[in-house]
Regions:
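Hydrophobic alpha-helical
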Residues: 1-37
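Sec-exported extracytoplasmic/periplasmic mature domains
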Residues: 13-17, 40, 44, 61-68
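Short, charged, surface-exposed secondary-structure boundary motifs
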Residues: 35-39, 56-59
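Short beta-strand elements at the ligand-binding edges of bilobed clamshell
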Residues: 41-53
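Hinge/cleft segment of the Venus flytrap/periplasmic-binding protein
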Residues: 51-103
C-alpha cells in the first residue's frame, strides 16, 4: 500500500488488521513520529520524506523577502527540497535527522 501523505499513512496504521502476517506492505510519505515507530516495529517498510525544517525556513524567508520595503524580488514557485528514502537502515542515522518530523 502506498499512502500519499502522512494523514493517510497514519489512518492506515490505525486500521485494525486481522492477521499481521497477511498485512500488505506499507510505504508512506513524511517521517512522522508514528511512522518512525511503525518503521522500527516492521509495520511500515519505509517512507519518502522531505526536510520539514528547511521547508518551513524557505517559506518564512520567502514571506520576509516579499514584504521588504522597496525591494524587487523573484520568488521561486517550486523549490526542490531533496526528498530521501527513510527505512530501518537509516532511521537513526544523523545524516537523515533533518527528514524526521517531531511532534
Amino acid at each position: 500500500v502506498f499512502c500519499t501523505n502522512a494523514d493517510i499513512t497514519e489512518m492506515y496504521l490505525n486500521l485494525e488488521k486481522s492477521d499481521e502476517h497477511d498485512a500488505p506492505a506499507l510505504v508512506g510519505v513524511d517521517a512522522t513520529t508514528k511512522q518512525q515507530e511503525a518503521i522500527r516495529n516492521g509495520e511500515e517498510i519505509g517512507c519518502v520524506s522531505q526536510q520539514p525544517y528547511a521547508m518551513g525556513y524557505q517559506t518564512i524567508w520567502a514571506a520576509v523577502e516579499t514584504t521588504a520595503p522597496k525591494k524587487s524580488v523573484v520568488i521561486e514557485k517550486n523549490v526542490l527540497s531533496n526528498p530521501a528514502w527513510i527505512d530501518a537502515d537509516c532511521l537513526d542515522d544523523p545524516d537523515y535527522s533533518g527528514y524526521l518530523y517531531t511532534e
